Swiss-Prot record:
SUPFAM superfamilies noted in UniProt: Acylphosphatase/BLUF domain-like
Native species: Paenarthrobacter aurescens (strain TC1)
Identification of the protein by name: Acylphosphatase
Domain Acylphosphatase-like: 7-94
Keyword Hydrolase annotated: yes
Residues spanning the membrane: none
Keyword line: Hydrolase
Enzyme Commission identifier(s): 3.6.1.7
Keyword Hydrolase: yes
Organism superkingdom: Bacteria
Positions of the catalytic residues: 22, 40
Principal EC category: hydrolase
Sequence similarity: Belongs to the acylphosphatase family.
Length: 94
């Protein structure tokens, strides 16, 4: 088992605005003890940045792809890199 902390940067497209997607994503991130942000983008997508253990980052990626995520997720483009440690908690950005 590794203690490596990773950073997930994701762009989620589909019907993901106006359906509580950011709220439920923040709730899931809190459940997984992830730190970062989620925000709506002008193009109708949602941007997610989350840092945490490799297992927790993997869990939120799987959740985003699942039918449990609110709205209708059509695509999740994401990158995983080393965490920066810049976040103290998880926040929804308006």
């Amino acid at each position: 088992m590794t203690d490596e902390t990773l950073r997930l940067t994701a762009r989620i497209t589909g019907v993901v605005q106006g359906v509580g997607f950011r709220y439920w994503t923040a709730r899931k991130a809190d459940e997984l003890l992830l730190k970062g942000t989620v925000r709506n983008s002008a193009d109708g997508s949602v941007e997610l940045v989350a840092e945490g253990s490799a297992a927790d980052v993997d869990s939120i990626v799987k959740w985003l792809h699942s039918s449990r995520a609110p709205g209708r997720v059509e695509n999740v483009d994401f990158q995983v890199s080393d965490a920066t440690g810049e976040f103290d908690d998880f926040r929804i950005i308006d």
